[in-house]
Amino acid sequence: KTAQKITQEIHLICQSPTKQNGTVLLRNRELSILEHADGYVMLFPTLKNIFEAHMTKDGHLVQIYCSSAVTESNLENLFHAIRPFFLFIAQKNGKFAVHSASLLYKEKAWLFSGHSGMGKSTHTNLWKELFGTPLLNGDLNLIGEENGQFFVYGIPWCGTSGICTTEKQRLGGIVLLGRDAKDNRFEIMTPAERVLRVMQRMISPSWTDELV
């Protein structure tokens, strides 16, 4: 039986919000998340035209309070503000985001993941230069399972790479990059190591025990 998809509506409200208090779940330079009885409140300190955003507990309704001024900068900020809500509802539908660069090789998507600065984009760009492999996304990839097979779904968020696609491709595998000054090698990890390393690279929401 196919699970029913959970949908999401995003409303833009061009006025100041009614400030809501709540329990702080996350706070960093770019995002603060508070929880209250009816849902979540999100604040985006670096996105000056985004006043505040509210989301129901199940993610079906999002209200973004923002400036009515239409500028290239404001639209870019709005695009970035929508991402956590999209990733929340994607996770509710069994799809998870992995910080990685991806390419298409032999009709399958291959992801290269590692810490920032590890060389994900350098690696995929070398594949393109040497073998002509198309690049799919330069920063973030959404993975899900359908009928026992894993797929990578195209999304528009791609960091500063400018590389993204709307295509859906079968997942070939995930290469987890490391660094060793003395040697270049491949290692086959144990199942437990694979799960742990991939989870460390996930961008999907993990604000509460339920989301983890």
Describe the predicted segments one by one.
Residues K1-S116, L126-L136, N141-V212:
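A noncatalytic interaction/capping subdomain that flanks phosphate/NTP-handling catalytic cores
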Residues H123:
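Hydrophobic positions on the alpha1 helix immediately C-terminal to the Walker A/P-loop
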